């Protein structure tokens, strides 16, 4: 009798118990909701005993995996700090503005006057406009974002980490 369950035990040995419990619950609810006549007719048509139950179990397993991945994705999204979300959504042009800051830690950024990228970053609250001089504007990286940039910057990928 134990030889029948050995392959199943090996299959589910690396699966989290929570996912296995979800699979069993989905499997039970699906079998309970599907009419008995349909199950009997399906197994009689295919002439393979218990095929319908095996298919429903496989379906339950896939649904449980999908829901656990979806839940993990949603948790990961909502566990991010608001500042981290802003940094993750920066474009390549916006990240290029901070190249000097990320290398040296210099909080002052210079750019040509009326630069649209700088205006976007100012609206996002990442930088503050300090002064203008001949064809040049000076900006300061805010203290809050300078901390998060240093914390989440990955110099290898040249992106901010999650």
Swiss-Prot record:
UniProt KW keywords: Cell inner membrane, Cell membrane, Membrane, Transmembrane, Transmembrane helix
Membrane topology: Multi-pass membrane protein
Keyword Transmembrane helix applies: yes
One cellular-component annotation, GO: plasma membrane
Residue spans crossing the bilayer: 22-42, 48-68
One Pfam family recorded for the sequence: SieB
Residue ranges the record marks as coiled coil: none
Lineage: superkingdom: Bacteria
Subcellular location: Cell inner membrane
Main location, first listed in the record: membrane
Protein name (database record): Superinfection exclusion protein B
Organism per entry: Escherichia coli (strain K12)
Gene that encodes the chain: sieB
């Amino acid at each position: 009798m134990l030889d029948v369950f050995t392959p199943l035990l090996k299959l589910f040995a690396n699966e989290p118990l929570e996912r296995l419990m979800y699979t069993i619950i989905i499997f039970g609810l699906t079998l309970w909701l599907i009419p008995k006549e349909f199950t009997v007719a399906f197994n009689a048509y295919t002439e393979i005993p218990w095929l319908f139950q095996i298919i429903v179990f496989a379906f339950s397993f896939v649904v449980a995996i999908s829901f656990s991945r979806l839940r993990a994705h949603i948790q990961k999204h909502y566990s991010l700090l608001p500042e981290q979300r802003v940094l993750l959504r920066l474009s390549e042009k916006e990240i290029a503005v901070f190249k000097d800051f990320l290398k040296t830690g210099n909080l002052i950024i210079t750019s040509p006057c009326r630069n649209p990228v700088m205006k976007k970053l100012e609206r996002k609250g990442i930088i503050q406009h300090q002064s203008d001089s001949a064809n040049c504007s000076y900006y300061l990286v805010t203290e809050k974002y300078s901390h998060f940039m240093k914390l989440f910057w990955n110099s290898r990928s040249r992106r901010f980490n999650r």
